Amino acid sequence: MIKLAIDGMGGDNAPKEIVEGSILALKQFDDIELTIFGDVDKMKPYLIEHPRLKVVHTPKYFEMGVKDIGRHTLRDDKDTSMLMAINHVKEGLADGVVSSGPTQALIFASFFMIRPMKEMKRVAIAPMVPTVIGKPTILLDAGGNIDAKAEHLLDFAIFSTIALKEVYGVKSPKVGLINIGTEPGKGRDIDKETFELLSKHPLIDFYGNLEPKEILTSDAQILLSDGFTANIVMKTMEGTASALGKILKREIKASFWGKLAAVLFLKKPLKRFKQSMSADEVGGALIAGLDKVVVKAHGSSEAYAFMNAIRQAKTMVSHDVIGKVKNVLRGQDE
């Protein structure tokens, strides 16, 4: 049985969507046990009796806009729903943690409580992103390391390759190195050095350099760069998707015929378009480099999306993704 700790109060839609997503997961997967940490009074309207569900009460939780995160957090906020869930994993009472709470707090607390795996030199944020090809695609590092080295990016590529193989069944995910041109000699020193490392590694199916204009349409399912570049890419993708949606709505509403066409012919295609650009189907961001499984669900996750974040976590545990990453990294260090 896979045991997961859930931050019941993290996220814009907590606790309702978090609790309901957890219950969906219990109904969908018969090999998990969940412990939800949060304010029982606020969660009560959405809770059910279930033999594989435990609830631990705490009235404290992190607001989504929290900024003051530091060493004092581990001492002063240890009874928040997020830190109690992380501590459950630290104490060996759960195999992984899922939270929609503030990213900075989750990464900081996980780093110092669960600890990084010794084999990886940095921790990275690895969100799943929607693309035109409609296949599971990871972007990393989405903001964790703006001063990364080539060896760190290689570690991130290895982690993502194993995660896509084990969690999503991708046989040979291609790694694309985000760069200003496709030629091997393009980019900064870190890009050139990373290109060489990726080209030579036996586990990596290297796509080559990937120009930003190709990100949504290429066959690469791992979009790799340092935290500064990848974070800009992620936010540009979010902004572009939002802008396209607004433009489409504006044009449809501009005339009677546009509205009629939307009702008669475009309803299903628009629904499919929205689903293809949504991360709800694939879950949350993986936190690469920690000694246990940590999944950061989107802050605005609704029940279905949170259920899929739980599915991510439970599959990572059942397929021993962390152990397999460690074995590969140990092998290359010997």
Curated annotation (Swiss-Prot):
Subcellular location: Cytoplasm
Pathway: Lipid metabolism; phospholipid metabolism
Any one GO biological process: fatty acid biosynthetic process
Pfam families per UniProt: FA_synthesis
Subunit (UniProt): Homodimer. Probably interacts with PlsY.
Record family assignment: Belongs to the PlsX family.
Function: Catalyzes the reversible formation of acyl-phosphate (acyl-PO(4)) from acyl-[acyl-carrier-protein] (acyl-ACP). This enzyme utilizes acyl-ACP as fatty acyl donor, but not acyl-CoA.
UniProt protein name: Phosphate acyltransferase
Annotated source species: Acholeplasma laidlawii (strain PG-8A)
Gene: plsX
